[in-house]
Amino acid sequence: MNKRVKIVSTLGPAVEIRGGKKFGESGYWGESLDVEASAKNIAALIEEGANVFRFNFSHGDHPEQGARMATVHRAEEIAGHKVGFLLDTKGPEMRTELFADGADAISVVTGDKFRVATKQGLKSTPELIALNVAGGLDIFDDVEIGQTILIDDGKLGLSLTGKDAATREFEVEAQNDGVIGKQKGVNIPNTKIPFPALAERDDADIRFGLSQPGGINFIAISFVRTANDVKEVRRICEETGNPHVQLLAKIENQQGIENLDEIIEAADGIMIARGDMGIEVPFEMVPVYQKLIISKVNKAGKIVVTATNMLESMTYNPRATRSEISDVFNAVIDGTDATMLSGESANGKYPRESVRTMATVNKNAQTMLKEYGRLHPERYDKSTVTEVVAASVKNAAEAMDIKLIVALTESGNTARLISKHRPNADILAITFDEKVERGLMINWGVIPTMTEKPSSTDDMFEVAEKVALASGLVESGDNIIIVAGVPVGTGRTNTMRIRTVK
């Protein structure tokens, strides 16, 4: 059985060699990227089970990310497998400003009182912490007395005890001992801040990614609050001639949860970004929302990626904790299409081991989906011919113990709909366009491949059998299910045929 749950692996310096030096060694960042050595490390991740690589534009400039993308193309050649390319936007965010005296951080103790400035363009001091807010917003009027300001992923909490309208500053009191570092993330739960739908930097980053050789296949849009946030990115993709790029809305706050249905409808999929979500909403609700989101996205037949802190301890340790293993396992049982590695593979000590561990857990968990899974295919929409065929394919595969479904698909939609039903079989998606092929890398159970478009219906079924045999997924004498649209090029799926491989 092949691994059907996909892995999104974030790339960063952990797998990159510069001037013969590894990340963490003295002088590393002063050296040029060694493309060949780095590509071999990335190829190793592909061999261990990475299906999609994530380029996190919260870190690194365009030259760095462009070189990283080019290195992945070389890694594909070494590994002999293609992967998907996912650009993750920085998104609208707040961070602490630099300190006026050049300090990296200041220490505070419980009960310390000081101020937080909402005016933009200031520098921090021990008495006044300045904020850098996306879009240059002044958030003074958006935050109420009694709310909590969280710094550095919630490591430090500040109670907002007063507001000074004359200076537009917050009066705050430290809830615990901690430090305030420069350029650390700031969250204010239960607050609706009127960020622009798309920050200027995100617009530039997206256009840069789309312009790279080979382009990108997925965009993860950070801090999506409404469907309009997704539509803004869709507009850029269409404007630049990239309507095929799939958009994953990152659900990270209460507003995103409240508007979940409209966001799912507007996007091609959802990324459950549990890091910021765990700060923006009550932490005990994170697993509840994870199950809710996965269930809704499964029903819609779209992509769902579970992300953040999945194997966090492997950033520093060669083995995951038992709770982390359970976390990955349960995400698969919940119905996720893919699980994601962040710091573990981007800047951790054990990127290859992290991918291997996640692949092992994913593969084990998928064998128990039928017994423990939370899918309810009987509730899925069956109002179209393609939906009915997709449901029938799953039933036929299970009734006849068929291990391979071959879907000939121009847009990828047929394979996605079959994947939605989680059949106990691999789904070999035969496409005729590399963009479609790469766009299927993230879907559960789908093994995409590309070939020449058949010229007739008879040729179509012959091609399906030939490609299936060449893939090594079946042998002569095995039964396969072939799903396609007849006649060729109709753009709709209306035919299911069970065929014995010659």
Swiss-Prot record:
Annotated catalysed reactions: pyruvate + ATP = phosphoenolpyruvate + ADP + H(+)
InterPro entries noted in UniProt: Pyr_Knase (IPR001697), Pyrv/PenolPyrv_kinase-like_dom (IPR015813), Pyrv_kinase-like_dom_sf (IPR040442), Pyrv_Knase-like_insert_dom_sf (IPR011037), Pyrv_Knase_AS (IPR018209), Pyrv_Knase_brl (IPR015793), Pyrv_Knase_C (IPR015795), Pyrv_Knase_C_sf (IPR036918)
Enzyme Commission identifier(s): 2.7.1.40
Keywords, alphabetical: Allosteric enzyme, ATP-binding, Glycolysis, Kinase, Magnesium, Metal-binding, Nucleotide-binding, Potassium, Pyruvate, Transferase
Binding residue positions for Mg(2+): 252, 276
List of residues binding K(+): 56, 58, 88-89
Binding site for substrate: 54, 275-276, 308
Keyword S-adenosyl-L-methionine in annotation: no
Example GO molecular function: ATP binding
UniProt-listed PROSITE patterns: PYRUVATE_KINASE (PS00110)
Name of a matching Pfam family: PK_C
Cofactor(s) needed for function: Mg(2+); K(+)
Gene Ontology annotations for the cellular component aspect, listed alphabetically: cell surface
PANTHER family tied to this protein: PYRUVATE KINASE
Subunit structure: Homotetramer.
Listed name of the protein: Pyruvate kinase
Source organism of the structure: Lactococcus lactis subsp. lactis (strain IL1403)
